[in-house]
């Protein structure tokens, strides 16, 4: 039987995780290793300054105390699989909220898949895009389309093989609709950012900050092939990504500059 390693960044109690387990539980042997607490926007961070501890919730379902999604995949591959063995696929998600454009560099969900890609394991990050409010999206839309997409893509990989190259993963974003309109293969778009740091003071006058979430806005391109545009049009966006961040097009200019 095929084996799937599941992780996320929303924690072990998230609705998206439960939906993903329901979607995949009868087509593969699942091992679930997720953070004990929400780790949204933790990026590809690996814990090096304190010990980590598995807590088994159910058979093959673990939460990792103080762990990140990267920790979860790293430790699962190190300790839960016999020597030389690997899962057939790693699936990270289903994330509550979008992971598009440059936001993928912040995303713990994407990092979980990227950690798998580093080990050359087929890996997918799946995110449920929200309307203006994620709680309302969960209530009104739910995760039914995301469940369908997760299962469909995993079955395609099992039947047809991995469609991307070595050390690549797929970043999948599902629009906030109930009906499946289809897939679009996309590039990562360019996000619009602005400062959302809010200063507060506690009753003792000590200052502290909350970092706010940016509204989902992007820079329109000449070609309508980015993840933002696909999701806006109601399609599931699939973006192939890799850990290699080299800007190859800049190398000749830098050589001449020196």
UniProtKB/Swiss-Prot annotation:
Residues that hold a divalent metal cation according to the record: 9-10, 40, 95
Keyword match Cytoplasm: yes
Cofactor: a divalent metal cation
Chemical reaction(s) catalysed: a ribonucleoside 5'-phosphate + H2O = a ribonucleoside + phosphate
An MF annotation (GO) of this entry: nucleotide binding
Keywords: Cytoplasm, Hydrolase, Metal-binding, Nucleotide-binding
Cellular localisation: Cytoplasm
Primary site of residence: cytoplasm
Function comment: Nucleotidase that shows phosphatase activity on nucleoside 5'-monophosphates.
PANTHER family in UniProt: 5'-NUCLEOTIDASE SURE, 5'_3'-NUCLEOTIDASE SURE
Protein name as annotated: 5'-nucleotidase SurE
